[in-house]
């Protein structure tokens, strides 16, 4: 489908991206860059960085609920070695900036190791489609509670972050 819409031959496409894994990694890089900028816009510069994290992860999870093709891409990205490594390394840099003040004794490497776990939580929720009991809103609350506790965010602030995201039209933001 990508080859067809791009208007190039499959051999030229392969030369550009080397392989399916190269295409996935390029796509992941593009999506990663755009999601954090969208999240920064939605969270506003006046709010603490933890809100940017919450909006960014909410966008990812919401996208997988709105589009099965995107669910497959995200799941593959969190599974395929090169793409997953890119996600974890780049996310660790963001996490260090966002959560470093909550755990000043931790290094960027420590946040990389924490990201391995939080990425697993994210992938788990992405892999399980919402249903009548596990709604998107419930998924987001559970994810924020688990991940923000791992980053040592105080309980009161976790509650404020959850209420903030619940006040957003995350589906509309995700579709932009």
Predicted regions located by residue number:
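Hydrophobic alpha-helical connector segments
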Residues: 26, 37-72, 79-80, 88-92
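C-terminal peripheral helix-coil segments that are non-catalytic and often amphipathic
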Residues: 97-101, 131-176
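Contiguous, function-dense segments enriched for cysteine-driven chemistry
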Residues: 32, 36
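Short, hydrophobic secondary-structure boundary micro-motifs
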Residues: 71-76, 157-160
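Amphipathic alpha-helical packing segments from all-alpha helical-bundle domains
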Residues: 76-130, 134, 138-145
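Phosphate/oxyanion-binding loops and surfaces in catalytic or ligand/nucleic-acid-binding neighborhoods
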Residues: 63, 67, 121, 149-154
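Helix-turn-helix
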Residues: 1-22, 26
